[in-house]
Regions:
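Catalytic histidine-centered segment of alpha/beta-hydrolase-like enzymes
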Residues: 260-271
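Alpha/beta-hydrolase fold nucleophile elbow
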Residues: 134-146
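Hydrolase active-site cap/lid region
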Residues: 154-206, 215
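Conserved alpha/beta-hydrolase
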Residues: 86-108
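An N-terminal hydrophobic leader/cap segment in hydrolases
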Residues: 2-48, 55-58
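Conserved alpha/beta-hydrolase "acid-adjacent" motif
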Residues: 233-239, 266
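Short beta-strand/loop motif that positions the catalytic acidic residue
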Residues: 219-221, 226-228, 232
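Alpha/beta-hydrolase active-site loop
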Residues: 112-133
Length: 286
């Protein structure tokens, strides 16, 4: 009995070490921007966010009362990685806020990053845009990539009045995405992977089922354009079709294009279709 009593603190320490290792292993790599939106009328902003955390971003106004977009990267990304979209969307008449999520780029650190926290940061960006004099606060949209796309759909599911969402390479369900990632690391689902999935849900405070794009899309009422690379090996294009199939009504359009998860090749060839969708749903400047 005494041996077991003395062993309990050691087991607790060991278990705590396992959980710490999981959190560190899943934490995003922080990559700081090296470039800027050269040639555009940008200004650097720090947006006050959730938990008092400051979010770094580039604000690119397009004139008075322009429709505006929050543009958010994926896991381990930053605002610079979304720069290929900036010039053509600005030329089309949109004001832009390219934002770093917490724990990414030049934004503040926090206890952890997650899809729901990406969503909080997107909403912070939308609220900030809505009060800028150059922006028409009634015509706001979101462009998100990967985790940022899933977060954009989560925001759309609970924010009435949002004008449009463009989802780039969204996964259908976080559990499926994590199981693929764990398998790529040769981590068996049972029992290790199953424990990791349960632990992550406990830490972030959400069940994966409640934040999965294939579930949240049923509550989205604004127009959505799902864009997916046909050669995406990280998130198969079929997952975009799953999301579309789960939507109610005809609010969701699907555009499958050449490219992988992070590289869509000639962005200039595809941006016209994104711009057309956004102009149709948010309208033109003025």
């Amino acid at each position: 009995m005494n041996v077991w009593i003395w062993s309990l603190p050691l087991l607790a320490v060991a278990w705590g070490g396992v959980n710490l290792a999981i959190r560190r292993g899943l934490a995003p790599e922080r990559v700081v921007e090296q470039a800027t939106p050269e040639g555009l009328p940008w200004r650097e902003v720090m947006v006050p966010g959730t938990n008092g955390k400051q979010l770094f971003g580039w604000f690119i106004p397009a004139g008075e009362r322009a429709p505006a977009l929050v543009i958010i990267h994926g896991w381990g990304g930053n605002a610079e990685m979304m720069l290929p979209l900036a010039a053509p969307l600005h030329a089309a008449g949109f004001a832009l806020l390219l934002l770093d999520a917490r724990c990414h780029g030049r934004s503040a650190d926090d206890s952890f990053a997650s899809l729901p926290r990406f969503a909080e940061d997107i909403e912070t960006g939308l609220d900030w845009l809505a009060v800028q004099p150059e922006v028409d606060g009634g015509r706001l949209g979101i462009i998100g990539h990967s985790v940022g796309a899933g977060a954009a759909l989560l925001v759309a599911s609970r924010r009435p009045g949002l004008g449009a969402v463009v989802s780039l390479a969204a996964f259908a369900h976080p559990a499926l995405m994590m199981r693929r990632w764990l398998a790529s690391k040769n981590i068996p689902h049972w029992p290790v992977g199953a424990y990791i999935l349960a632990y992550v849900q406990r830490v972030i405070g959400y069940r994966f089922d409640d934040i999965a794009p294939c579930r949240t899309i049923a509550h989205v009422r604004c127009p959505v354009l799902l864009v997916h690379g046909q050669d995406d090996a990280t998130v198969p294009a079929d997952e975009a079709r799953q999301i579309q199939a789960a939507a109610l009504g005809d609010v969701v359009e699907l555009l499958v294009i050449p490219g992988s998860h992070d590289n869509y090749g000639d962005v200039g060839r595809q941006i016209g279709r994104l711009s057309d969708f956004l102009l149709r749903t948010l309208g033109r400047m003025g």
